[in-house]
Amino acid sequence: MVQKFPEPTVGALIINKDKLLLVKSPKWKYQKWTVPGGHIEVGESAEQAIVREAKEETGLDVIPIKLLLVQEAVFSEEYYKPMHYLFFDFLCKAKNDNVKLDNRELNEYRWFDKKEIHNADVESYTKNLLKAYKEYDSGNSSLLYIPVRSQKT
């Protein structure tokens, strides 16, 4: 059954002591690096969702700093479940660096230095997020939007 409406989700690019957290999830094909995140629940703001999802998936308490990027994925072949997603991607600050993965959602993590993260093997949506972060980190604080990339019509 095809869903009738897009699925709003959040992603967290988590920073702590000038290092950025990336994770691997079995939900993403090709086992590339991505960011923790998930669905926004009914009655929950995007900021509340990112705090909850970061805690559930990584064990980290985070503070949302900025909404960096909004992007859409329509039936992407990179994700295990082809749907229409709206990604609200936040930069978040971790209160500590003691990661405890939810192994049902994630199977690996790594703290990357800011300089090396742009060379990491990431899926395409995280690549867009890292570009938005680089702009933000260089002083350009505008919100970016990446239009639909559809695999099917």
Labelled PLM ranges:
Residues 10, 62-65:
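Small-residue-enriched segments and motifs
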Residues 30-33, 104-153:
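Nudix hydrolase/Nudix homology domain
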Residues 6, 31, 82-86:
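Residue-level preference for beta-strand/loop junctions
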Residues 67-70:
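Residue-level recognition of beta-strand microenvironments
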